[in-house]
């Protein structure tokens, strides 16, 4: 009976359960370490072997979940054993303390590893989403009778978007278009109104010029400050000053042109008179010579005497040439 009591005692059962639990946790940790080493090796070539890396991650997560489930059962045993401390021996208490320390260490390691794996998993999920996102933008188009559901849904979405329907809003009427003004009207509106120089303003302009020393000395800025006209700019004064200078120069230039014309006309008249006088003197001399040579008669043609004298001289020259030519022919054998 005593031996049977020892076999059926709760202390022996709890001692064996605790030892079995510790061994299972240690085995799980060994497997986790091995899988993590393999995972570190595959991380260098994760693009070439993405499925293998995913399998290792799933296996590590599964073992860690199993270890957590094993560790969650230990507080219940500890509480139950603490109630029945007189039944347990010193060996059971030592095992419990050792198991508690080991559990704390394993829990810290598991927490650190879990954080590391969660970070890696989040990075992998981000990469997968980036790889899938460009593929989602490409519509699935199939030929024949077997059209994909994605293409039909995309078509429906496109039709709804083109019609202006959304899931959260009803179709709204189009907003009326605002009539736009033509471009030339806008330019005319933006263009500054031209300055109108009325007689009063021009009189003030002339007074300012006279006080400042004349149009050749005064500057547009000085004229504007002296006039004190609201809204008058330097450019407007400058343009009006240029026009005023041209207006002043026009009468002077016309007078100079008229004097030059008169002077030229007088010179031309004087030269013409001199020529006429010389011609008249020559004709009088010719007339006197002709009258002395020719017999006096009732008809006198002074105008033809000069021409006849010229013709006779030409005829004398031709006669002399012909006579010399005939003499040369006679001399030649």
From Swiss-Prot:
Residues 287-303 have a biased composition (Polar residues). Probable transcription factor involved in phosphate signaling in roots. One of its GO terms (cellular component) is nucleus. Its main location: nucleus. This is Transcription factor HHO6. InterPro entries: Homeodomain-like_sf, HRS1-like, Myb_dom, Myb_dom_plants, SANT/Myb. The gene is HHO6. One of its GO terms (biological process) is regulation of DNA-templated transcription. It comes from the Eukaryota. Residues 189-249 form the HTH myb-type domain. The lineage of its organism: Eukaryota, Viridiplantae, Streptophyta, Embryophyta, Tracheophyta. Keywords: DNA-binding, Nucleus, Transcription, Transcription regulation. It is found in: Nucleus. Residues 274-333 are annotated as: Disordered. Residues 319-333 have a biased composition (Basic and acidic residues). It holds the Pfam family Myb_DNA-binding. Residues 220-245 bind DNA. GO terms for molecular function: DNA-binding transcription factor activity; transcription cis-regulatory region binding. It comes from Arabidopsis thaliana.
């Amino acid at each position: 009976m005593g031996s049977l009591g020892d076999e059926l005692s709760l202390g022996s059962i709890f001692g064996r359960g605790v030892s079995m639990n510790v061994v299972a946790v240690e085995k799980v940790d060994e497997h986790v370490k091995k899988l993590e080493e393999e995972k570190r090796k595959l991380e260098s070539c994760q693009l070439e072997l993405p499925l293998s890396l995913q399998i290792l991650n799933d296996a590590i997560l599964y073992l860690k979940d199993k270890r957590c489930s094993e560790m969650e059962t230990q507080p219940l045993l500890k509480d139950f054993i603490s109630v029945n401390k007189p039944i347990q021996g010193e060996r059971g208490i030592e095992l419990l303390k050792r198991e508690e320390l080991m559990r704390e260490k394993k829990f810290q390691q598991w927490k650190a590893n879990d954080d590391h794996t969660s970070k890696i998993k989040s990075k992998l999920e981000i990469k997968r989403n980036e790889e899938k996102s460009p593929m989602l933008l490409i519509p699935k188009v199939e030929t024949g009778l077997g059209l994909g559901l994605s293409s039909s849904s995309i078509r429906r979405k496109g039709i709804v978007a083109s019609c202006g329907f959304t899931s959260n809003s009803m179709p709204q009427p189009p907003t009326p278009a605002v009539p736009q003004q033509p471009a030339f009207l806008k330019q005319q509106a933006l263009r500054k109104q031209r300055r109108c120089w009325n007689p009063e303003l021009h009189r003030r302009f002339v007074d300012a010029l006279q006080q400042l020393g004349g149009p050749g000395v005064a500057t547009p800025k000085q004229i504007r400050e002296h006039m004190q006209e609201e809204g008058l700019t330097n450019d407007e004064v400058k343009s009006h000053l240029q026009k005023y200078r041209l207006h002043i120069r026009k009468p002077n230039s016309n007078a100079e042109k008229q004097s030059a014309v008169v002077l030229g006309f007088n010179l031309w008249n004087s030269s013409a008179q001199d020529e006429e006088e010389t011609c008249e003197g020559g004709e009088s001399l010719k007339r006197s010579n002709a009258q002395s040579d020719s017999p006096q008669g009732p008809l006198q043609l002074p105008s033809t005497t000069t021409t006849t004298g010229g013709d006779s001289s030409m005829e004398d020259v031709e006669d002399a040439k012909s006579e010399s030519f005939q003499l040369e022919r006679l001399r030649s054998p």
